[in-house]
Amino acid sequence: MESKAQEIILSCEINSIERGSLKNLSIIHMSCNDFNISFDIIDSINIFSQKEKVKAFISKNRLSYTNDDFCGHGYIVTELKDSSSNNGNRYITIISLFGLLVKIISNKESFLKIHQLNVMDHIYFCVKKNT
């Protein structure tokens, strides 16, 4: 995991792609360093496949991108702490990309605390194929 000037870069592998609850929507599940990330993507723009290696970028600054990347911007909506006995101290951070959701699960520590982010911060989120 790299972090430079509020740009977070995570190396990830796509574990699965499943149908979402809404028509033409899929949910991509990734393992990224110490985090698991799930995000909604519209089927017509899904460029990813299972077991693919990608990088996830989260930044307060606009990121450069190409047609081979999935990028959006939105707001950190909330972070919940799940202290149930099954999960230990698990944190779930939700980002809304104006309707599409990104869910970041940390089993150790608050994602927001680690990266000095706050609820309602405007952020950019990109998933880019490894080149």
Swiss-Prot record:
Q: In Gene Ontology terms, what is a biological process of this protein?
A: DNA-templated transcription
Q: Would the keyword Membrane turn up in this protein's UniProt record? A: no
The highest taxon in the source lineage is Archaea
Q: What class of enzyme is it?
A: transferase
What EC number(s) does this enzyme carry? 2.7.7.6
Q: Where in the cell is it found?
A: Cytoplasm
- What does it do? DNA-dependent RNA polymerase (RNAP) catalyzes the transcription of DNA into RNA using the four ribonucleoside triphosphates as substrates.
Gene from which the chain derives: rpo8
Q: What is its main location?
A: cytoplasm
The name of this protein is DNA-directed RNA polymerase subunit Rpo8
Native organism is Saccharolobus shibatae (strain ATCC 51178 / DSM 5389 / JCM 8931 / NBRC 15437 / B12)
Alphabetized NCBIfam families for the sequence: PRK14980.1
Annotated Gene Ontology MF terms?
DNA-directed RNA polymerase activity
For this UniProt record, the keywords arranged alphabetically read as follows: Cytoplasm, DNA-directed RNA polymerase, Nucleotidyltransferase, Transcription, Transferase
Listed GO CC annotations: cytoplasm; DNA-directed RNA polymerase complex
Q: Which reaction does it catalyse?
A: RNA(n) + a ribonucleoside 5'-triphosphate = RNA(n+1) + diphosphate
Protein family: Belongs to the archaeal Rpo8 RNA polymerase subunit family.
InterPro entries xref list: NA-bd_OB-fold (IPR012340), RNA_pol_Rpo8 (IPR031555)
Complex formation:
Part of the 13-subunit RNA polymerase complex. Interacts with Rpo1N on the periphery of the clamp head.
